[in-house]
Amino acid sequence: MPFLHLFTPYTNADNTKLILRVNESRLRLFTRQLLAEFFGTLFVVYIVSGSTLAANFAVSDPIVRVCLICLVQGFAFAAIIWSISGISGCQLNPAVTVGCVTTGRMGILNGIAFIIFQCVGALVGAGMMKASLPTFYERDLSATTLATGVNVARGFFLEMVTTSFLVFVVLGVAVYNEWDPKISRVAPLAIGCAVIAGVGFLNLFTGGSLNPARSFGPAVFSDTWHRHYIYWFGPICGGIIAGLFWRIFLSEKVLLIDRPYTDFHRSTYGTATK
């Protein structure tokens, strides 16, 4: 099949064509998943860092500033999740990945690989933002730091509880929701709303991380490491708590069986699949 076409070879409206999903190797699927996590986290960190810097420079009213920051982050997450969730689940967050591993729905080695590519994507996204801005606008590249009066214990607790809320929502609408496709279709919006709520609540106290990768990228390029460990231990503990809560108390018992009868079946999205 040629790489480029002079004319569009088919459209979804062409009744003479049938789109079939071709089986692919596990290695190719896993590679696509890792690349999806890499590029998704890259875009998230780039947009989050840029929007935070823009709000801090352009908006003097603190309420408007926080609203702008949390809305941009929430909508950015929702848009990216909608675009690539069919490939990797679009976790974009080591805390979410740890939560998925804790539930048993994701393998440990898969989770480690996801986290590595998320962190590399965060580094590239923060580096791109640093390269995009004049030195005057760089500052700390929106690295997350504790506010005055917020000690280590409070910062850890705030990040842990709020991230557990975010991961709780992710697991509920995207991981443990096997039976209602209507909820799956709006899952990115629900996750985006959880990000808006979490960032809006935490912004004043901890900078609103909820995501170790989001804090890691800007910290590297701005050399902002003061109590950085909070933004790893807090969210990851929150992810573990949410994962255990779903696994022990809220999950249904499911049974995995072989697909019966036919070689072809109709997929969730209505396209014929082999």
UniProtKB/Swiss-Prot annotation:
Organism: Dictyostelium discoideum (Social amoeba)
SUPFAM superfamilies documented for this protein: Aquaporin-like (SSF81338)
GO MF, one annotated term: water channel activity
Topology in the lipid bilayer: Multi-pass membrane protein
The protein's role, per its UniProt record: May form a water-specific channel.
Short name of any one Pfam family annotated for the protein: MIP
Stretches of the chain found on the membrane's Cytoplasmic side: 1-33, 88-105, 176-185, 251-274
Origin organism lineage: Eukaryota, Amoebozoa, Evosea, Eumycetozoa, Dictyostelia
Keywords: Cell membrane, Membrane, Repeat, Transmembrane, Transmembrane helix, Transport
Parts of the chain that traverse the membrane: 34-54, 67-87, 106-126, 155-175, 186-206, 230-250
Motif stretch (NPA 1): 93-95
Protein's gene: wacA
Any one of the GO CC terms: plasma membrane
Localization, UniProt: Cell membrane
Name assigned to this protein: Aquaporin C
